[in-house]
């Protein structure tokens, strides 16, 4: 018996990996976060599969379902939104699986920041503008951020920021970043990237909060901050330069 942690991707059913889809179809038990994983993803499960929405369950209850499946020698598809390695809370589940000597696998998924970049139609790593992306969040009701990982510190890098779980914390986001990025720094607020009701709000650090408040969007969004969001000044990369030689493009 094996528990398969599966990244469902950002939302669109056709953005799940083939491996993820096939594992959901093959497992007799499917546990999924109903608040974040669309019904179309869960529909890949077999008709006779036991499908359980874990949104109202705590960790002990989720593990109880897994232990029941283990006792019945039934594989489990544990479906998480996005990529399970990012804010998927799989760490505590893995710790318990190891204690119970239950095998597990992890199938990656398309992460939210990649879906947001696609929705915006841009590259996040432009030469001379930004070559670094920091994936982070802010602390509200969730666990505290480790020392040194607050936005005031991360902002000193000037890197492009992909800020998760912070739709209701834009006041702090803007307050902490304006000293490092400037009030005119572009910001994109992407609500439910790749879902049918996806919304994109563009602004700057000085006005994005008011724009989001006016749209009455308070959850399930990612905030991108950086100059890459609004520039045509980037130089071309060296990758395709005529004088750039490598083993597959020898001189002449």
Q: Whereabouts are the PLM-identified features?
A:
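Class I SAM-dependent methyltransferase SAM-binding "motif I" and its flanking Rossmann-like core
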Residues: 1, 12, 83-157, 199-202
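Class I S-adenosyl-L-methionine
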Residues: 1-110, 115
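A contiguous loop/helix-start segment that scaffolds small-molecule binding in enzyme catalytic cores
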Residues: 2-5, 61, 72-76, 132, ...
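A generic local structural motif
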Residues: 15-20, 38-39, 63-65, 121-122, ...
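Short secondary-structure boundary/capping segments
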Residues: 21, 43, 68, 124-126, ...
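Structural recognition of alpha->loop->beta junctions
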Residues: 26-27, 96-103, 127, 208-217
């Amino acid at each position: 018996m094996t528990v398969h942690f599966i990244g469902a991707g950002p939302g669109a059913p056709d953005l799940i990996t083939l491996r993820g889809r096939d594992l959901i179809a093959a497992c007799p038990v499917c546990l999924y976060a109903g608040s974040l994983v669309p019904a179309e993803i869960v529909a890949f499960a077999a008709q006779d599969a036991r499908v359980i929405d874990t949104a109202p369950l705590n960790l002990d209850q989720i593990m109880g379902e897994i232990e029941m499946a283990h006792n019945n020698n039934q594989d489990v598809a544990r479906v998480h939104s996005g990529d399970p390695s990012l804010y998927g809370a799989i760490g505590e589940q893995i710790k318990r699986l190891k204690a119970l000597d239950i095998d597990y696998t992890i199938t990656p998924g398309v992460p939210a920041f990649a879906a947001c970049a696609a929705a915006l139609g841009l590259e996040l790593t432009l030469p001379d503008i930004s070559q670094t992306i920091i994936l982070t969040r802010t602390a509200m009701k969730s666990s505290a951020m480790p020392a040194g990982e607050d936005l005031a510190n991360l902002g000193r890098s000037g890197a492009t920021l992909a800020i998760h779980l912070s739709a209701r914390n834009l006041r702090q986001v803007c307050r902490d970043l304006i000293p490092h990025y400037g009030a005119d720094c572009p910001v994109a607020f992407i609500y439910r990237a790749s879902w049918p009701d996806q919304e994109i709000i563009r602004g700057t650090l000085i006005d994005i909060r008011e724009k989001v408040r006016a749209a009455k969007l308070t959850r399930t969004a990612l905030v991108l901050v950086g100059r890459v969001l609004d520039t045509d000044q980037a130089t071309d990369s060296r990758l395709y330069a005529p004088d750039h030689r490598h083993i597959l493009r020898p001189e002449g």
